[in-house]
Amino acid sequence: MEEGLLVRKIREGTVIDHIPAGRALNVLKILGLTGREGLTIAVVMNVPSRKLGVKDIVKVEKRFLEPSEVDKIALIAPSATINIIRDFQVASKRRVEPPAVVTGILRCPNPNCVTNSEREPVTPRFVRVSLSPLKLKCAYCEETLSEAEIVDQLVSPYG
């Protein structure tokens, strides 16, 4: 089989590579991309990968990521790489890493946690306890969040 480009190169923008298969649409949700922004967006799913077996790729022309967006992507795609493209060339490339401490992005699933009290507004805070599989622990009640729970919260409209 002849190998070639599935999607053309982009002039300026961001390529998010090495996304676990099936999570590209979650990445789009996290970035708030619906396809109505006027940006050229390419989503390639289930591409063969030596590193992951299969992977997803997201290319977004004329869009660069904020650090908070990179942190969220790292929580659902810890193996991802972010490539910044300028004039059709990779200007920078870096692997994401889930943050050691996550504040204000996720909510604690423990209804008795102080962060869920209406009387006492406390910002939820989680500490990373494991990278593979990704697990976070509430800094207040020590309830843990699995990778699946993290993904659900980040892509849920109620998250």
From Swiss-Prot:
UniProt keyword terms in alphabetical order: Metal-binding, Pyrimidine biosynthesis, Zinc
GO CC annotations, alphabetized: aspartate carbamoyltransferase complex
Keyword Cell membrane found: no
UniProt-listed GO biological process terms: 'de novo' pyrimidine nucleobase biosynthetic process; pyrimidine nucleotide biosynthetic process
Gene3D superfamilies assigned to the protein according to its UniProt record, in alphabetical order: Aspartate carbamoyltransferase regulatory subunit, C-terminal domain, Aspartate carbamoyltransferase regulatory subunit, N-terminal domain
Cofactor: Zn(2+)
Free-text comment on the cofactor: Binds 1 zinc ion per subunit.
HAMAP family attached to this UniProt entry: Asp_carb_tr_reg (MF_00002)
Cited function: Involved in allosteric regulation of aspartate carbamoyltransferase.
Family of the protein in this entry: Belongs to the PyrI family.
Oligomeric form and interacting partners: Contains catalytic and regulatory chains.
Name by which UniProt lists this protein: Aspartate carbamoyltransferase regulatory chain
Source organism: Thermofilum pendens (strain DSM 2475 / Hrk 5)
